[in-house]
Amino acid sequence: MQGTPYIYQGEEIGMTNAYFKSIDDYKDIEAINAYKEYTESGLMTEEEMLNCLKMVSRDNARTPMQWDDSANAGFTTGTPWISVNKNYTQINAKAALEDKDSVFYYYQKLIRLRHENEIIVEGVFHGLLEDNDDIYAYERTLGDEKLVVACNFTNKEVPCDLFEGKEGEELITNYKNHVTGVPVSYTHLTL
């Protein structure tokens, strides 16, 4: 995988989609027009269209930055142009900085690894387990070095023998005490 990584619109603290419950919560004219078009034509029910917008609306990335658990997530003392995500009391910059296992610090570790390991930037990409629908895995090679990455984006632990019997240094994982398989929502880099 080539390219420049970027961290965008609250991802560094784990901000999520807003999942607005009413079309009145949306401000994006594209979302509002699509809602009207699809519901009035009968192509989708109001509920189906709202479920679609919860996943794809640009307004998901336009909610105010969640700085802390105070009113309006610490973004403003006024009225924001769009509603603050309802999870701001749990997901916010202040809470992230106070939790050494937060998404924020995980991103910092990943950025540090990228700066310290040329293989992450310059290594040749090879897909692994390409027939496995549950695990996204690949390796990068650079000279004699090999970096293996395994990611499980499912909601269940998945059996995997990718690392079995192999020596290497675990560079980062978001699960500390796993025994077998690839845990739920798991990322693992081994050099």
Which ranges hold each PLM region?
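Beta-strand-rich binding/interaction modules
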Residues: 157-175
